[in-house]
Amino acid sequence: MRRTIPGARALVSAALAATLFISAAPATPAAAADPSEASQVIAIARAQRGDPWRYGATGPSAFDCSGLVIYSYKMAGDLSLIGNGNYRSASALYKYFRDRGRTSRTAATPGDLVVWGNGRHIGIYLGGGMAISTLTSGVRIHAVNAVTAPFTAYLRTGVYQLPKAPVVPAPVPSGSVVVSR
């Protein structure tokens, strides 16, 4: 048996419109403006693109590979995550992390470190198979497999990643009528 409720169509239409409006609303500005530590480290490293390579340089106008890593973490306030700057070479950073934080290619996250040549070269993992490091041509973004030295390891630094936002269903407006047969 079918019953007609006066005004039900208008109410259902209004509820649907409200649901669509609420679910299409952008994320709150506070959440969008709160970058993770990893994105801060990466943004600082990216800002150095094009700076020249110089052996032993730690910035801000020239870098070697470990100098870029140390500078990026230091400027982001995360130097404690990579040994407080006490490890000044790629091989020293590799030795520091070798037994503390190795991770796999599939589990590596942006902000982790990438090591090539058993510690002869180091960079920052950007995600998607890409890294940023200081090559002899300067600070560059490149594929992890583009470095001529053989890949050695991904190293987990513990840099904070923003969690993915959970999917929350839109609330049903109060006073809604659910009509069932």
Where are these regions (language model features)?
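Generic alpha-helical structural context detector
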Residues: 13, 43-46, 70-74, 133
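Bacterial N-terminal signal peptides
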Residues: 13-23
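Extracytoplasmic low-complexity, Pro/Thr/Ser/Ala/Gly-rich segments
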Residues: 34-49, 53
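Generic helix-packing signal
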Residues: 42, 49, 73-76, 115, ...
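Catalytic cysteine-centered active-site loop
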Residues: 51-110, 151
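Short beta-strand segments that buttress and anchor functional surface loops
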Residues: 111-118
